[in-house]
Amino acid sequence: MASIDFRNKINWHRRYRSPQGVKTEHEILRIFESDRGRIINSPAIRRLQQKTQVFPLERNAAVRTRLTHSMEVQQVGRYIAKEILSRLKEQNRLEEYGLDALTGPFESIVEMACLMHDIGNPPFGHFGEAAINDWFRQRLHPEDAESQPLTHDRCVVSSLRLQEGEENLNDIRRKVRQDICHFEGNAQGIRLVHTLMRMNLTWAQVGGILKYTRPAWWRGPVPDSHRYLMKKPGYYLSEEKYIARLRKELQLAPYSRFPLTWIMEAADDISYCVADLEDAVEKRIFSVEQLYHHLYHAWGHHEKDSLFELVVGNAWEKSRANTLSRSTEDQFFMYLRVNTLNKLVPYAAQRFIDNLPQIFAGTFNQALLEDASGFSRLLGLYKNVAVEHVFSHPDVEQLELQGYRVISGLLDIYQPLLSLSLNDFRELVEKERLKRFPIESRLFQKLSTRHRLAYVEVVSKLPTDSAEYPVLEYYYRCRLIQDYISGMTDLYAWDEYRRLMAVEQ
């Protein structure tokens, strides 16, 4: 078994203009402080304040947005990281694992990965993702790319339709169609950080947000050894070369994960489970008393000193004891959060340490808080109650359906840009307005300059005389539209849809 040396993982170099030479502990920490500044000051982080956590288009500032949720995840991630480092220090293993001079970067990478973990999410969360993927599937039919004979291919885009006698090109068409129809927030986060925002973060910092290791163009079953790590797309074809370089720099085997990503994932799991329930009470979906009864009955068999009694029961009793001086709601969630963290954070930290050989290798094929333990059961309890009583609430479902319609409608509106021929779209990009295409010209003008420049940069590097050119040009045109719409906030997408559908009041 290879030795564990985090100096080989916490790579402080960057893709562009990387610092050179051997660095002192302080100099390395300054490099990661620069990462923090780049991330915290990025527009993508600011936009999280108007993106959905659970309740779309929420006006109540006490209810969480993606930004406030991410800040809470950041704090829990820091807590877990410190707990891990503290335990390793007690065991005199910091130096053995190459962490004695890297505790600051270790914590910083985890914190910033937590803050960025939702950076690529589209408006309206998972329903926004579903709307994008459904819309493109209805036009590209990636499942038909496997069909024989080729005449069964229902793809409406001629350059992406399979052709007889073009097997090499057909392979690229299959990849492109599969990739475009698998938009995913985590993969979009990688694209945002590297391609769109050009943040030029350290290799280690980007490794921290590569949560899933399956390429978006993957077809067929995934290997059992990586079934959990590859359960969702983690990056797109457009970032394939960058991810290949990232793997080399971080010494990651194919489809393996960066070690600190497990901490970010655990912090997210701990944070949102309690937060979703608190937001539901704030929204008056149920009362604290009703929530307690939901949790009590969902737990099943009760024993005096069970984990449920130590965490949930304790919070309930303490909150009822202080009803005269403080809000029961505030008290209950304060104690519930504290009790949950005090149990789950040490457990997550110990799981990280106990499984460090596999985690360091990037092959640990499960989450830190998904096992047969009571701690995992407690987390599952929170999730199940939220699914049964929060996400299925009529008000929540109505807003989700509205969000799905908004994103689908925006894609319908911008569809004329995808219908233009290669030559017509190329001319529109060069001249920005064409009299013979008044609608397309106005739609093109509305696209973000950042997204248009990203399209121009990558397409200008493609050899125009290559047989692949029409296929790849259309791929990046689809990415352009997905980049623009997925980058909107909930409120902007809602307003833009109403304006362009001429239903603005």
Curated annotation (Swiss-Prot):
SUPFAM superfamilies for this protein: HD-domain/PDEase-like
GO MF entries: dGTPase activity; magnesium ion binding
Organism: Salmonella enteritidis PT4 (strain P125109)
Family to which this protein belongs: Belongs to the dGTPase family. Type 1 subfamily.
Superkingdom assignment: Bacteria
Identification of the protein by name: Deoxyguanosinetriphosphate triphosphohydrolase
Catalysed reaction, written as an equation: dGTP + H2O = 2'-deoxyguanosine + triphosphate + H(+)
InterPro entries: dGTP_triP_hydro_central_sf (IPR023293), dGTPase (IPR006261), dGTPase-like (IPR050135), dNTPase_1 (IPR020779), HD/PDEase_dom (IPR003607), HD_domain (IPR006674)
Key word Transferase present: no
Gene name, Swiss-Prot/TrEMBL: dgt
Phylogenetic lineage: Bacteria, Pseudomonadati, Pseudomonadota, Gammaproteobacteria, Enterobacterales
Cofactor(s) for this UniProt protein: Mg(2+)
Annotated EC: 3.1.5.1
Physiological role: dGTPase preferentially hydrolyzes dGTP over the other canonical NTPs.
GO biological process, one term: dGTP catabolic process
